[in-house]
């Protein structure tokens, strides 16, 4: 009987540690973290920016797009589809910033009810910050984000 108690005593903490590790590794949906509405129809606009450093002049080049349902419904739907499909992995506490001299993407989706929505900052290597917590984006989500940016560039340039 004593061995059974000892076994149960050590089984409980081991199960809790395993559960914590699985929760840590479980990917989180971007739309849930950003507190977005249930459907893309409830989004008023999406602000999409790409900030790229110019290493020769030490300045930053910012390209910004504001997509609305009235002007660009297809593009807005494409960005919203990405926001609803993308997954963030491995949350890590951080100081809320990304310190890297590389390319950064900034996405902000504004709901139709004008409620406050967080912004997601994404570096080219897949690191992201939402509400001061660092995450990693999957490679296929980063590839889709690059494709959306290229699509926006071909339309507006």
Residue ranges of predicted features:
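Function-determining sites in protein domains
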Residues: 2-157
């Amino acid at each position: 009987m004593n061995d059974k108690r000892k076994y149960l005593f050590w089984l409980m903490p081991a199960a809790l540690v395993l559960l914590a590790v699985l929760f840590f590794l479980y990917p989180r949906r971007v739309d849930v973290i950003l507190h977005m509405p249930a459907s893309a129809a409830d989004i008023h606009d999406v602000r999409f920016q790409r900030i790229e450093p110019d290493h020769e002049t030490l300045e930053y080049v910012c390209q910004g797009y504001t997509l609305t349902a009235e002007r660009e419904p297809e593009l807005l739907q494409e960005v919203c589809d990405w926001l609803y499909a993308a997954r963030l992995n491995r949350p890590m506490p951080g100081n809320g910033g990304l310190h890297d001299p590389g390319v950064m993407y900034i996405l902000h989706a504004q709901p139709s009810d004008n409620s406050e929505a967080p912004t997601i900052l994404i570096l080219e290597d897949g690191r992201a910050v939402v509400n001061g917590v660092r995450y990693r984006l999957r490679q296929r989500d980063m590839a889709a984000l690059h494709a959306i940016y290229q699509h926006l560039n071909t339309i507006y340039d």
